[in-house]
UniProtKB/Swiss-Prot annotation:
Subunit relationships: Part of the 50S ribosomal subunit.
InterPro entries in UniProt: Ribosomal_uL4, Ribosomal_uL4-like, Ribosomal_uL4_dom_sf
HAMAP family assigned to the protein according to its UniProt record, in alphabetical order: Ribosomal_uL4_B
One BP annotation, GO: translation
GO MF assignments: rRNA binding; structural constituent of ribosome
Keywords: Repressor, Ribonucleoprotein, Ribosomal protein, RNA-binding, rRNA-binding, Transcription, Transcription regulation, Transcription termination, Translation regulation
Family: Belongs to the universal ribosomal protein uL4 family.
Name assigned to this protein: Large ribosomal subunit protein uL4
Coiled coil: none
Organism name: Morganella morganii
Keyword Nucleotide-binding: no
Role, per record: One of the primary rRNA binding proteins, this protein initially binds near the 5'-end of the 23S rRNA. It is important during the early stages of 50S assembly. It makes multiple contacts with different domains of the 23S rRNA in the assembled 50S subunit and ribosome.
Region feature (Disordered): 44-70
Cysteine pairings via disulfide bonds: none
Length: 200
């Protein structure tokens, strides 16, 4: 299939990577798994067995007029243990390579259909200056954008790192969540070839 580039040239790309049907269920599963994998899972609370304190009965069972009590570590008491205490856990979900690649292909194909994927011959700035990149993006009418190159140019990376809703990555760093999150994705022709090789 042919994709029209920004400068009116066309680029021949694989239909299996950029022209497949959108598999919403697969994309949802991969995105949820990706987000789950980012969770720290380090929260921890103490049960009544783990709270520091004496095991002594606070007062005798009968005769005081107070409610009976057997431990200062009871969950009913202030500073007592937690009834169903949270423990550290691994939230990661398994996603095999075939599913992950399939989700990326689905997302890239949907970006093409929605005219959110812009292909350029090359994308660079002459110096590591934010204003140069801002002007370049303004000329292209782009704001919320992820720029994908076959290798990250240092000038481009430094110019973009202080910009809101602008991200620069190489092909190996793209992921399903980021591709969906940005309004537009600018990709160099070299990066497109690299993506095809990576997802082949």
């Amino acid at each position: 299939m042919e994709l029209v580039m920004k400068d009116a040239q066309s680029l021949t790309v694989s239909e299996t990577t950029f022209g497949r049907d959108f598999n919403e269920a697969l994309v949802h599963q991969v995105v949820v798994a990706y987000a789950a994998g980012a969770r720290q899972g380090t929260r921890a609370q103490k049960t009544r067995a783990e709270v520091t304190g004496s095991g002594k009965k606070p007062w005798r069972q009968k005769g005081t007029g107070r409610a009976r009590s057997g431990s200062i570590k009871s969950p009913i008491w202030r500073s007592g243990g937690i009834t169903f205490a949270a423990k550290p856990q691994d939230h990661s979900q398994k996603v095999n390579k075939k599913m992950y690649r399939g989700a990326l292909k689905s997302i890239l194909s949907e970006l093409v259909r929605q005219d959110r994927l812009i292909i350029v011959e090359k994308f660079a700035v002459e110096a590591p200056k934010t204003k140069l990149l801002v002007q370049k993006l303004k000329d292209m009418a782009l704001e919320d954008v992820m720029i994908v190159t076959h290798e990250v140019d240092e000038n481009l990376f430094l110019a973009a790192r202080n910009l809101y809703k602008v991200d620069v990555r190489d092909v190996t760093a793209i992921d399903p969540v980021s591709l969906i999150a940005f309004g537009k994705v600018v990709m160099t022709a070299e990066a497109v070839k690299q993506v095809e090789e990576m997802l082949a």
